Amino acid sequence: MKPSIRPHSAVLFVGLFAWIAFNASAAVAPRPPEQMMEEATHVVEGKVVAIVSKTQKSKVERGLLIARDRIFEITLETTMVDKGEGIKKGDPLTLQAWQPSIRFPAMPGPQGHQPVPANGDLVKVYLLYNEKSKTYHPFMPNGISILGPPRKTK
């Protein structure tokens, strides 16, 4: 009688599936505005004056995965500062947001910032300042609130 490879394949398959399921992360739940206001280093409102994006290898997802993220560099003209020091009305402020671009195999996980504003949108952003990289990052996933299209001024 020849030994069968099927039991070994089944064990390998179940083990691989269990490992992937154990290491899979879930989407991040939206935070209430009160919690973001309390935890943020800066909270500002402004008009989006520039938005640039690029796709790069993911810093969020790792492992047996082909993962690319779309990184957005968003520049605001600050119209109001609700919290934080070092930013004044009228100052330009650049922040970084991201969304997944490619995931193979498709797995659940963080979905980045939702929504990402368009050029000209009025937004309120709840930010965390990273001292090391000197960059601002909105809370994930809902640290960017679109207040509306730009207001017309006379």
Spans of features found by a protein language model:
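Bacterial N-terminal signal peptides that target proteins for export
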Residues: 2-12
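Transition segments tied to proteolytic processing and entry into folded domains
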Residues: 4, 19-154
